[in-house]
């Protein structure tokens, strides 16, 4: 799984970097030719895209390194750090967009050749949609937080390019303040996306538990297994592609140690079949010593 994960995540990061570089060149020409503040906003966003995607590429490669003596749980948390860094990059570009929009709202500037801007923005929109579609497929396959953060970033670019098309169309008919108004709206939306991305990254760094549905699947696997009377103290988290799962099994007092170990091994393999690549730790407890208080999961 780790090989497939690494290959897909690396390709997604490289694709994003190449696409952002191509779009930057196109937008530099479009801004120089039209003077549109919305296209300037998109140009600045492409600069941020390149910085964020390059950061993503470097961090993803680092996060894929195997565990070592100093990082016994691996380097997966680097993905969360990349997502947090991206949220900061994006917040900065959103602030620049907002301030530029206010300036041009107060002093609107007529646009040169909005038709050229429309063509360029259409090209950027199509390219970004293709990239987001690929990233969404990679996220579905890998659940990579770094790629998901990048995807959210480029999804906001799709919204931005759509808004720019409308603004350029209105400017073509003489409503020059539309350009600035849409720049303000885009800035607000991008800031919202950045804050949401930063929140998710911080939650991962704080070792938030796996989603409720995944934890319930683990409980269902454990409590339905022959020889297991119940379970307690389920603890989960995720670091990069790896899920970390710890749980205590409750077994009959007179069950031989070898048999208890065999049951625990079978449960572990069942969990790994459902969540490949996980790090699973199972502890066996005799029913008579199981504390009555705390979070317990009994057979139904």
From Swiss-Prot:
What gene does this protein come from? fieF
Listed GO CC annotations: plasma membrane
Q: How does it sit in the membrane?
A: Multi-pass membrane protein
Q: Which family does it belong to?
A: Belongs to the cation diffusion facilitator (CDF) transporter (TC 2.A.4) family. FieF subfamily.
| Name of protein | Cation-efflux pump FieF
Q: Which domain of life is it from?
A: Bacteria
Is Signal there in the keyword field? no
Species of provenance: Citrobacter koseri (strain ATCC BAA-895 / CDC 4225-83 / SGSC4696)
Provide this UniProt record's keywords sorted from A to Z: Cell inner membrane, Cell membrane, Ion transport, Iron, Iron transport, Membrane, Metal-binding, Transmembrane, Transmembrane helix, Transport, Zinc, Zinc transport
């Amino acid at each position: 799984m780790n090989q497939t994960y690494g290959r897909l995540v690396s390709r997604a990061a490289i694709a994003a970097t190449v696409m952002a570089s191509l779009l930057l060149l196109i937008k530099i020409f479009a801004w120089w030719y039209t003077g549109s503040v919305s296209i300037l906003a998109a140009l600045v966003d492409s600069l941020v895209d390149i910085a964020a995607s390059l950061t993503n590429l470097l961090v993803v490669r680092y996060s894929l390194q195997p565990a070592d003596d100093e990082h016994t749980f691996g380097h997966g948390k680097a993905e969360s750090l990349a997502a947090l860094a991206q949220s900061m990059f994006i917040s900065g570009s959103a602030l620049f967009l907002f301030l530029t929009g206010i300036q041009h709202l107060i002093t609107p500037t007529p646009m040169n050749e909005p038709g050229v801007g429309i063509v360029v923005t259409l090209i950027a929109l199509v390219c970004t949609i293709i990239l987001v579609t690929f990233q969404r497929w990679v996220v579905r396959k890998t659940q990579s937080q770094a790629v998901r953060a990048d995807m959210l970033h480029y999804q906001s670019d799709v919204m931005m390019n759509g808004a720019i098309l409308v603004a350029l169309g209105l400017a073509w008919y003489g409503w020059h303040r539309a350009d600035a108004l849409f720049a303000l709206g885009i800035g607000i939306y991008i800031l919202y996306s950045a804050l949401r991305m930063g929140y998710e990254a911080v939650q991962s760094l704080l070792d938030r538990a796996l989603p409720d549905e995944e934890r319930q699947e683990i409980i269902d696997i454990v409590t339905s297994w022959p020889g297991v009377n119940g379970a307690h103290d389920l603890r989960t988290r995720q670091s990069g592609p790896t899920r970390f799962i710890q749980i205590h099994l409750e077994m009959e007092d007179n069950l031989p140690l070898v048999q208890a170990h065999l049951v625990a091994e079978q449960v572990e393999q069942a969990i790994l079949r459902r969540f490949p690549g996980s790090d699973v730790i199972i502890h066996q407890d005799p029913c008579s010593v199981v504390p009555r208080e705390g979070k317990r999961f009994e057979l139904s």
